[in-house]
A protein has these predicted regions:
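Alpha-helical transmembrane-bundle signature of multi-pass membrane transport and export proteins
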Residues: 1-244
Length: 244
């Protein structure tokens, strides 16, 4: 459970701090903010299925350790750039792409590990995990709301340290070797295609997938762009207002 919060808290910080840096600090336009926000999600769109495949084929504990270490680098690098007064729009794009890529591999490994840890208490574990996730996100939002007063550098350092702590926490987990694979499953790409077909054709998972796509398309994307712009241009607000 501590491993879950070690990634969710930094993502909560990023959710507020990243658009604040783009829209408030750099005063970028709405279209450039949209591109920046898209960059945080774009790697996951193409890599999340490969992340799931990797989690099925390799030790999930090792994946979590390695990618948590890697995930600590972008925030630390961005903090260094800000300390050197070298912050730029393209530096933020690079940060977004790196974090999006890392997240595409951490999430499947974390979810797979959760299934192993839960055992026969899966429903209870999922409920507790959801509660921790919401709580950790709120903590991240609250921390990032102080960006106007303390600046971004301390928050980026905090972001990096918490993510790195996830690697240390994962060291305490038992090894999670991959489950036996079906020799008739075919190539990795065919396995991904088969998984997509199962989800799309499922009377339960298919509608849920459509609903999530609709929410992301018609609400999520516009919200993460319009909210910071409205806060900045209409209300003259900053990080604390964005976090609300």
């Amino acid at each position: 459970m501590a491993g879950v919060t070690s990634f969710v808290i930094p993502m909560g910080i990023q959710t507020i701090l990243f658009p604040w840096l783009v829209a408030v600090q750099l005063q970028e336009s709405a279209d450039r903010l949209g591109i920046a926000q898209m960059s945080t999600q774009l790697p996951g769109l193409f890599l999340i299925l490969f992340g799931g495949l990797l989690a099925d084929r390799f030790d999930q504990r090792k994946i979590l350790i390695g990618f948590h270490v890697i995930a600590a680098i972008p925030a630390a690098g961005l903090a260094l750039l800000m300390y050197l007064d070298l912050l730029s729009y393209w530096a933020l794009i690079g940060y977004a792409l790196m974090m999006g890529t890392v997240g595409a591999f951490i999430q499947p490994a974390r979810d797979g590990m959760l299934n192993r840890v839960a055992g026969d208490q899966l429903q209870r574990t999922v409920t507790v995990t959801m509660g921790l996730t919401f709580g950790a996100q709120i903590f991240g939002f609250a921390a990032a709301s102080f960006a106007d007063s303390i600046g971004a550098i301390p928050l980026l350092v905090l972001h990096s340290l918490i993510v790195f702590s996830g690697a240390l926490i994962s060291l305490k987990l038992k090894p999670a070797p991959p489950q036996p694979q079906d020799v008739n499953a075919g190539s990795r790409l065919n396995q991904i295609k088969s998984g997509l077909k199962v989800v799309i054709r499922s009377p339960r998972m298919g509608p849920a997938l459509v609903m999530m796509m609709a929410m992301s398309t018609f609400y999520g994307g516009s919200f993460v762009v319009l909210n910071p712009i409205i806060v900045r241009d209409i209300y003259g607000g900053g990080a604390s207002e964005i976090s609300m």
